[in-house]
Amino acid sequence: YKYTYIYGKPQFIYSCKLVPTDKTPAGKRDDISLREKEAQIKKDLDDGIDTVGGKMTVCQLYDKKNNQRKNIKRATEKGRQYLMNSLKNDPLGMRAIDTVKQSDAKEWAIRMSEKGYAYKTIDNYKRSLKASFYMAIQDDCIRKNPFDFKLSDVLEDDTEPKVILTPEQEERLLAFMETDKVYRKYYDEVVFLLETGLRISEFCGLTVADIDMQNRILNIDHQLLKDTEIGYYIETPKTKNGKRELPLTERAYQALQRILKNRGKAQPLIVGGYSNFLFLNREGLPKVAGNYVGMLRGLIKKYN
């Protein structure tokens, strides 16, 4: 059957059966008849459905969606790469989007879980794919969104809830650090982190210039991160509320005074226009989240 698409380009479809009552010839795969396919195409054309666009793969659709927004944070870019790589290594990635049903999307989620992906990661990926398929609906490529379902209906949320330390637990931990031969050198940094409530990347990004000791205020307008590919880099807050001035408590102020007094010599490093970072490792380079993750794990193990 030959038909002309809305842009004037001829398209062809084939079937080994003319009408539904015809038998499938020996050696041929069972398929709907040509007349049924013809009826589907006529309905799609009448409804303005892009039958050609519906043949793009899930990978192509996700790439098209990503190309709609280029100005993104590096963490978002890395997340996109991870999802694209997972799609390329999964049967779903090469499927035409007009063939993907909700059962296929649910089977994808189950496969992801079996591969060891965390529930939250799968949920984030599902949200991205749902947005991609929504774009395909808006572009009249498909009618329904196969990712329009609750992940909790398919997988059990096994995410362990974060447990916040009580004030009493904080004090006991700090008392232990203050007298421990190994961890007492981190005491002031942990006090400062707990008192300010900063994100660890904001904490690591603090520079001497961000500190107003006279008015006891911190200026928070950037984060310091480190990547295996590009090394240190600076990120700015996603929203205006991320930029703020933070007043120091008396305890934070006292800890900061000791930190400045005991601070080693910084290497002449400039990252994204920022230098003279407050928290340094033994080489005089800025500490990053990974340094504190390792330290805190060791501390907790010894404390417990």
What is each stretch, according to the model?
Residues 62, 105, 129, 140, ...:
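Conserved hydrophobic/aromatic pocket- or pore-lining residues that grip, position, or stack substrates
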